[in-house]
């Protein structure tokens, strides 16, 4: 795992990071002013009655601070119970007569450029899900299907070894689409950059 992608979470709509399916929508935002408009519009949209009554899962708006591609500066991560549930949600937001969707879409389109999307499915998560974890390190990698069982077992062993000292949460996911050569990834959450650096320093000494 040579590559690390570091992101900071701007906004979270709910507390859950345990949904088995999570979809990333990647966007490019040119400046902080446009980013602020997107944050405000997202917050308003996720607080609407339409979302409260129809969206099952959670949404997280993230900013890339290191390791991302030039084309992407931010991403929306939608965590939902299944791909089927996500398809239901997509059908609802595709209604051209939905005013809440139209308002949100107009702000998003005026202040960002769509880059792509990725579909991921959690294999296993570890630690306690918390929206206090706003700094996320992502470690994508490629492996053969025949290696996955051994990787899961090694991850379980790692969790047992660090569960009493590791301050954050982490998960192992399979990348189903949009990842190019990548097949899997680890996501590791911390409350702050300082917490991440402190853990990395202590782990390297152990």
Predicted ranges, named:
Residues 4-14:
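Sec-dependent N-terminal signal peptides
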Residues 17-206:
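Short S/T/G/P-rich N-terminal loop/turn motif that feeds into the first structured element of a domain
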């Amino acid at each position: 795992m040579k590559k690390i992608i570091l992101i900071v979470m701007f906004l979270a709509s709910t507390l859950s990071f345990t949904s088995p399916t999570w979809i990333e929508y990647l966007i490019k935002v040119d400046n902080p002013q446009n980013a602020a408009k997107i944050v405000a519009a997202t917050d308003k949209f996720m607080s609407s009655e339409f979302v409260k009554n129809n969206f099952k899962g959670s949404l997280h708006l993230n900013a890339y601070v290191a390791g991302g591609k030039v084309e992407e500066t931010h991403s929306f991560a939608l965590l939902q119970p299944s791909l089927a549930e996500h398809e239901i949600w997509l059908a609802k937001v595709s209604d051209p007569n939905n005013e809440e969707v139209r308002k949100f879409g107009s702000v998003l389109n005026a202040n960002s450029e769509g880059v792509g999307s990725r579909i991921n499915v959690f294999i296993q998560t570890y630690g306690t899900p918390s929206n206090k974890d706003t700094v996320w390190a992502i470690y994508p990698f490629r492996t053969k299907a025949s290696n996955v069982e051994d990787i899961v077992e090694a991850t379980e062993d790692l969790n047992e070894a660090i569960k009493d000292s590791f301050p954050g949460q982490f998960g192992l996911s399979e990348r189903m689409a949009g990842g190019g050569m990548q097949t899997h990834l680890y996501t590791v959450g911390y409350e702050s950059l300082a917490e991440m650096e402190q853990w990395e320093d202590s782990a390297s000494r152990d």
